[in-house]
Amino acid sequence: MHDAAALHVVEVLLVIGMAAWDARPLLSGEMARRFPRVFWTAAGLIIAIAVAALLAAIYAPALLHLMIVVAVALTSAAAWLGRVNYGRSRGLPPGSLSLQASIDALFDRSFYRNSAAWLGPVFKTLQFYQPTVCVVGLDRAHTLLRTYEDALGPSVQGFSRAIPQGFLRYMSIETHGVYGPMFRRALSSRVVSHHAAAMALAASRVLGDAARKADRAGGVLPDPYLDEMIDEAFLAVLFGLSPDDPDLPQLKSAYAPIARLHISSRPTPAVLAALAGVRQVLTARCARWRALPDAEVPICALSEFAKIDAGMPDDTCLDNLVFIYRISTMNVAGLLRWVLAHLAGHPDWISRLRAELDAETPSDGPALADRIVMETLRLSQAEYLYRRLRNDIGFEGYVLPKGWLVRLCIWESHRASDNFPEPDRFDPDRFLRDQPRTAYMPFGGDRHACNGVSLSNVICRVFLEELTRSYTWSVVGADAVEREFRHWSHWRPSRRMRLRLEPRRDAFSAAGQPARSQA
């Protein structure tokens, strides 16, 4: 009897030990700090398994034996899949499909770069609990996108299900062939540049607010001021809305549930109702504009659709505009945070930009503010593209299986020394020279590439020029980087980053006001 009890104790410990071993990547202190819900769910599962094993040992020893078999099978399968050479006989790329690899990618910004150096430019890993082929090198990415366009489908986020025919970047090739050209025209540089002066006024106003509230020793958190200026710019360019537009409160009220939706989540009935409410506001605006002379209709993306086609904008156009507003405001704010962080470490570029603005002499090639934004996109903001394989394909000597994700590693590819000498150095002047299409791809590289290039660049340029022209400024606390949300989100500078700014007494803002009056 004592021997049987001792055996049961060993069996219980074996079940608990294997469960804890399999879940160990989820039980680290880093997981507890960054993702407490995941940590405590994993810990709770281990406790539940321990309790079940103890009860089985007391009341159902046969069930305990079954638990051991299942635990051994799961642990063995995880170890087998985690081998770097797993699938070599089937032609799969090298790399581990272990949970540990997925967690490493979550916490280590250099994971993909280091993996490519070790395994080669095409390798496999596990992401979102799904097997993924990673491709480093934009020449390879372009070849893959061009050669296997029909075999590469979108990796669709949940919010796209709320939109008839889907979000622009997730549309089928045929559907995108209809809507893509319309959005390119609706978000053209002509439409965006019409709002540049208003953007400068908005930047001047929010920076004045920041300067009044800044503690000269510690500065202010830049996020609220970036968000306000960017929000105003997107509302104007997308919908023709100014801060005093009578439609704005109604649109904001209807939009509130959409603002709370995480883009990976399926839309709830409340979100669908909110989308219908926003659509109603925008449709009413379009109806009023049709009764106006062309000269009185605001120039914006919404009004451009009716010029393209009398039957537009339809629900697909309207819903896409709403979610472009939802997603892109956050992305542009992230880009501007990175611009500030990079310049914080390279104040000589701030001095150069101020000298260029004060002299009012055009650069040879893109303006310095534009080059700073382009270099920031290369070094930090542009990170990845995802596609999903519809069919098995052969690429670079490997088999890429149907159903797997493909991650095109943009951040790592932008740091290739064969395209960018000293690739880790911040050097906006490298964009005085045209970069080959296969070397620089911050907004995507196929027919689904982002249409908001002009809008993003103009917002960032206007803000940066207004800040530098009118203020003496610096940034502190920007050294650390962290995740914005989860595995699929962008990295960002530390949330502790603060902006210090004081008005330049001899400067005038883009709005034509003395900078001193803003403080």
Labelled PLM ranges:
Residues A19-D22, P93-F107, P131, V156-W289, ...:
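Cytochrome P450 catalytic-domain helical core, especially the substrate-recognition surface
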Residues T329-E356, V453-S470:
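Cytochrome P450 catalytic-core helices
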